[in-house]
């Protein structure tokens, strides 16, 4: 069972609880048994947390949010199979190198071809991965803000976890956390940011810490074209609890 299937199943659980239509093609990517196991807690989550009811599912095509709620509010839904862990933002969280650098070109005018020429590097995935590492570490506050917007730019955020056990079976005891009213932008203090790797020692993964709290992980895949960043949700909860987000 992969993470995408669990995430889509969580969306289906919400949609089916409140009779919101989901396209058959999208529905086929979920798992009915997982959706049913999550459905048990959905209504209580919405009621206890006073979340407006969903009226439209819009998660297809990498939309940054998953549901339109009553009063035109928005809801994003994420999940982990087991304990709270790493989750990628939409659109820019796990793109190919082509998509990533096209995004940088559109948003910031960063030209990957010009940068490769400046560094006298061939246009290969390995070279692009190196530029990704350099750009991420040199512009971490800016990129963190981008990742934050594509992850939390919503009125309500639900995160389901403890859905499956370590053998891939249903726990029948899914858990959920809810966040709302998060800042649209976060002022990241560069003095509080650290990495577990340097550009030169970074092979595949590089953990990002804020005030010594692990809040995310960069990953450069060796066997496929993917430049990934995922937030550590447990770490984000610690930042919120300690009032380190502003």
PLM regions with names:
Residues 1-65, 69-73, 79-246:
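Short, positively charged
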């Amino acid at each position: 069972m992969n993470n995408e299937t669990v995430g889509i199943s969580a969306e289906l659980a919400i949609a089916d609880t409140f009779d919101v239509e989901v396209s058959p093609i999208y529905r086929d990517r979920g798992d009915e048994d997982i959706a049913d196991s999550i459905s048990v807690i959905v209504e209580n989550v919405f009621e206890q947390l006073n979340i407006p009811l969903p009226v439209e599912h819009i998660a297809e095509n990498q939309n940054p949010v998953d549901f339109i709620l009553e009063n035109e509010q928005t809801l994003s839904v994420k999940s982990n199979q087991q304990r709270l862990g790493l989750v990628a933002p939409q659109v820019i969280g796990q793109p190919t190198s082509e998509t990533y650098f096209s995004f940088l070109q559109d948003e910031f005018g960063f030209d990957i071809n010009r940068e490769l020429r400046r560094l006298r590097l061939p246009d290969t995935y390995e070279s692009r991965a190196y530029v990704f590492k350099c750009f991420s570490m040199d512009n971490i506050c800016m990129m963190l803000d981008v990742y934050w917007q594509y992850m939390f730019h919503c009125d309500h955020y639900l995160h389901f976890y403890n859905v499956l056990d370590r053998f891939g079976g249903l726990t029948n005891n899914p858990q959920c956390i809810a966040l709302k009213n998060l800042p649209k932008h976060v002022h990241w203090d560069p003095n509080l940011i650290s990495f577990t790797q340097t550009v030169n020692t970074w092979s595949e993964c590089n953990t990002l810490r804020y005030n010594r709290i692990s809040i995310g992980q960069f990953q450069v895949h060796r066997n496929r074209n993917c430049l990934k960043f995922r937030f550590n949700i447990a770490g984000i909860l610690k930042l919120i609890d300690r009032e380190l987000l502003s």
